[in-house]
Amino acid sequence: HEYQAKDILADFGVDVQRGMVANNKDEAIAAAKKLTEETGTSLHVIKAQIHAGGRGKGGGVKLAKDLTELEIIVNQIIGMQLITPQTPPEGKKVNKVLVAEDVYYPGDSEPQEFYVSILLNRGVGKNMIMYSTEGGMDIETVAENTPELIFTEEIDPVHGLYPFQARNVAFNLGLSGDAYKGMLKFITTLYNAYVESDAS
């Protein structure tokens, strides 16, 4: 589940969206109150926890502006049969949600969503970073229609990630200032988590 993956990444020092898993509306409200104390915002993202991607487009990820909205959304999502392109035709039943802080990458201008992943390129037998300025939810469509908007960095299997490759990622994403520095740290810690947890 997403919440478990985030716990693993956080253990390696990767900055992740804060959140807590909830099995019912009471747990969700308690989680939201605690997150509001920690973050100062009453905006929360409610995310269905199933083993499939495409949850947002299937109605399994929603923004709650207050506790009343949160309760309504949690009641809608928990127990639903969530159908996404990655589930069987009948979907998967949602038994829990992640109540998470509403975040954007802290850029110098308007908030923007990026896609970043580290994966094993089986064709060349090397790990690589794949990334794009064209957000996370529609990356398959981006790859199909505008592949020139997807960048890659092949990682040397002996040396590992070179510092200039992390800089390439931040530069190609158009970042500057604190956002640029933050992305360097993010890429480095994400790569370390990938290697140390043997995620390939």
Per-region residue spans from a language model:
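ATP-grasp fold ATP-binding core
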Residues: 2-9, 36-56, 85-107, 116, ...
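Gly-rich Lys/Arg/Thr-decorated short loops/hinges at beta-loop-alpha junctions or inter-strand turns
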Residues: 8-14, 54-57, 148-150, 161-172
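Expand to "…catalyze enediolate/carbanion chemistry for C-C bond making/breaking, isomerization
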Residues: 4, 10, 17-18, 24-29, ...
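Hydrophobic alpha-helical hairpins/lids featuring a short glycine-rich hinge
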Residues: 88-155
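Glycine-rich, mobile lid/loop segments that gate access to catalytic sites or pores
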Residues: 154-200
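Catalytic core of tubulin tyrosine ligase-like
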Residues: 16, 68-87, 169
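Glycine-rich phosphate-binding loop of ATP-grasp-fold ATP-dependent ligases
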Residues: 16-19, 46-73, 115, 138-139
